[in-house]
Amino acid sequence: MVTTTEKTNIGYIRQVIGPVVDVEFPAGKLPQIYNALVIKGKNEAGQDLSVTCEVQQLLGDRKVRAVSMSTTDGLVRGLEVIDTGAPISVPVGEATLGRIFNVLGEPVDELGPVNAATTSPIHRDAPKLTDLETKPKVFETGIKVIDLLAPYRQGGKIGLFGGAGVGKTVLIQELINNIAKEHGGVSVFGGVGERTREGNDLYQEFKESGVIDEKNIANSKVALVYGQMNEPPGARMRVGLSALTMAEHFRDVNKQDVLLFIDNIFRFVQAGSEVSALLGRMPSAVGYQPTLGTDVGQLQERITSTLEGSITSIQAVYVPADDLTDPAPATTFAHLDATTVLSRGLASKGIYPAVDPLDSTSTMLQPSIVGEEHYRTARAVQSTLQRYKELQDIIAILGLDELSEEDRQTVARARKIEKFLSQPFFVAEVFTGSPGKYVKLEDTISGFNRILNGELDDLPEQAFYLVGDIQEAIEKGAKLKAES
């Protein structure tokens, strides 16, 4: 959705090179950087054209260089270009929930127009320092492994690492479900430069799990903004900002806590690199744009907690060739407050969510923030699991019987902890048949403490698998004993 104005400022196309369009305007009427330009007319076959571009450079000699948000097929020299006088604007508010948009805020789900009362420009300044909530606050997700070992910061940024088929989508769905039910919040999903099939699959799964309510679209908990792999680099570079603008409205106007998902933050950088090359800028390290730090910073600095509400962002991070020193992931890491690493090894054991308890990290895991008991419990859980990992080679070669009594006890408790880190999800109920569980942080801490203290050494391992709090594990253990 582009701000439309009267045809007061009209230019003409002088050159088209791929997605880059050079436009000449009358003297003294050059549009500003980031203004949206609209090209309407007919191509040589007589078909209607409607292309939106964003001004990126002022070339001098009354010319500007703009990057197109859609295909430039059919554009020719001399076509009329209208300067809208404002940046690209997208619809915001409740009307966006349950709908799919493109970078321009146009609905692409064939469900008709969006009745949004207001629109917002996608280019905005980050909140002022005086408006920020500076006291770190833990964002409770209700997912045991995350809340205990790698807690999220309210208004923070979390990197989500994981290959195909380890449960990223289900984890995202559960977080969307939990923020809606427990925090009264909403979510915005920004699909940046990923496969169209994945976007469609996600939409269908959201409908199946009830995150999007087909019967009453207003009850949906998420808005989706997609700019897929096949789209021009301009669209992929800006779609993250379109999603962020929708999230900002829920935070600033509705005063809600918002979850913003960006999949994938690397594709945002990649699109910026393509645009930079098209604009003729000198590349920097590994061929990335010279403005890499600025581009990432402008997006990330708008994702924060204010005194009114918060945007907590979970960003899938693709690491090219598994090289963490690559400039794209390295620049992203500088902004992250926590990392959630999904492990294929845990997924193959049937431990879901397959969050790696040793590789996942958080800056929030400090006694001064989470409290002494939480910190001590988390570190004890990690050291127990680390010791189990070290002993696995010995167990594989010599067997459990060759271990000392103390090590055998550590292994038994570690296996219970590993099982207890699994949890039934609300959004997976239709597949597993087990009702989902939201576990409060204090229940999570006390549960793991009781395993570490040896209070539950007599319970079978299986009692801890796919349960909510520790009370449920005790009841399941009693039931298993009775059956045996």
Swiss-Prot record:
It is found in: Cellular thylakoid membrane. SMART domains: AAA. Its main location: membrane. PROSITE patterns: ATPASE_ALPHA_BETA. It is an enzyme of class 7 (translocase). Its EC number is 7.1.2.2. Transmembrane segments: none annotated. It is a peripheral membrane protein. NCBIfam families: atpD (TIGR01039). This is ATP synthase subunit beta. It comes from Synechococcus elongatus (strain ATCC 33912 / PCC 7942 / FACHB-805) (Anacystis nidulans R2). The gene is atpD.
